[in-house]
Amino acid sequence: MNNKHPKNKAKSTTTPKTIALNKRARHEYHLIERHEAGLELQGWEVKAIRAGRANLGDGYAYVRDGEIFLIGAQITPLIQASTHVVANDRRTRKLLLHRRQIDTLIGRVQREGFTLVPTAMYWSKNRVKMEIALAKGKQAHDKRHAEKEREWQRDKQRIMRAHNRNA
């Protein structure tokens, strides 16, 4: 007998895995190294994230007292949010990392002049995780060079498609 629906089939999640992306980070920074970090969130923030109300556009991470905090990332509260909780959409949130990871990141930021930039927020086993990247700021000429490279890749693909259609 052919059973098409096994009992031990993994449940499909209804929420998409990626919550928010920081597309501007790739444009404005050279991303050197990426790390996964947890986020210390309040209940209303998790509900708002489930509703897709997170924005990483202006966010960055900084070091204070041997800990790493996220500032500038916006999580807009839901309209139905509780009245007894004051919801600050741009509050400072603590990033949860292992001590060894924190120490290496702090060292690279302080000694080598890197910046910590959030690049993505996503779900991992019903927990909100954030991908942060060690980054160096791009100069204006670097941005222009990257744009020219993207245009060339696009033109090259267009030429190859036209050539393959005619062949």
Curated annotation (Swiss-Prot):
Subcellular compartments: Cytoplasm
Any Pfam family hit: SmpB
InterPro entries with a match to the protein in the record: SmpB, SsrA-bd_prot, SsrA-bd_prot_CS
One Gene Ontology cellular component annotation held by this UniProt entry: cytosol
Domain of life: Bacteria
Keywords, comma-separated and alphabetical: Cytoplasm, RNA-binding
Main subcellular localisation: cytoplasm
Spans annotated as Disordered: 139-167
Gene Ontology terms, MF aspect: RNA binding
Composition skew (Basic and acidic residues), residue ranges: 144-158
GO biological process: trans-translation
Annotated NCBIfam families: PRK05422.1 (NF003843), smpB (TIGR00086)
Function: Required for rescue of stalled ribosomes mediated by trans-translation. Binds to transfer-messenger RNA (tmRNA), required for stable association of tmRNA with ribosomes. tmRNA and SmpB together mimic tRNA shape, replacing the anticodon stem-loop with SmpB. tmRNA is encoded by the ssrA gene; the 2 termini fold to resemble tRNA(Ala) and it encodes a 'tag peptide', a short internal open reading frame. During trans-translation Ala-aminoacylated tmRNA acts like a tRNA, entering the A-site of stalled ribosomes, displacing the stalled mRNA.
Record HAMAP family: SmpB
Alphabetized PANTHER family for the sequence: SSRA-BINDING PROTEIN (PTHR30308:SF2), TMRNA-BINDING COMPONENT OF TRANS-TRANSLATION TAGGING COMPLEX (PTHR30308)
Family to which the UniProt record says this protein belongs: Belongs to the SmpB family.
Annotated protein name in UniProt: SsrA-binding protein
Organism of origin: Xylella fastidiosa (strain M12)
Gene assigned in the entry: smpB
